[in-house]
Amino acid sequence: MEWHQDWAFYPYTNDDVLAVGVMLDDFTLDNGPLLLVPGSHKGPVLDHHSDGRFSGGIDPRSLHVDVSTAVPVLAPAGSISVHHARTIHGSDLNRSGQPRGLLLYEICAADAWPLAGGYGPFSDLEEFNARMICGEPTIEPRLERVPVRMPQPRPLDPTSIYNAQKGLERRFFAVLDKP
């Protein structure tokens, strides 16, 4: 999983947006755990395009942060991780032969409305409001001056981040070629 910011996939009207990961398996150094770059959420939103299309990853030449400071998330199955949607993160190859499942949830403030991506389609406000876990529903989004880059044009295969990142010309992490 190349270095990326979740915010690049789903920008909102304000950046009160978090990613919550539930570890379905143990996360160890051998199985390529999630790596988080501390403080990177306070920096710019980096370009996630390659060859004119959104690719879901940052070109290594554009990484203007010291990724050697990245902190591995090491924890047993059942643990959670929480990071800001603008945090630069990624993970190296899983070399352990053991699974490394992570179930990700995106949560945001009630007044953070998606500009692109995010939430998925909803047919009406009732369905939209049913997704609230706390707070009061609102149809008045809070607009803040936050850096936004739109994830357009879409990747050739937008079905997953892994497929989107296949379009990257340059990579930081090694990849396995599977038949």
What are these regions (language model features)?
Residues 86-179:
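Non-heme Fe(II)/2-oxoglutarate
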Residues 27-92:
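Double-stranded beta-helix
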Residues 17, 32, 100:
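Conserved catalytic motifs of the protein kinase core domain
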Residues 1, 54-67, 97-99, 117-127:
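Short, surface-exposed loop/helix-turn segments at secondary-structure junctions
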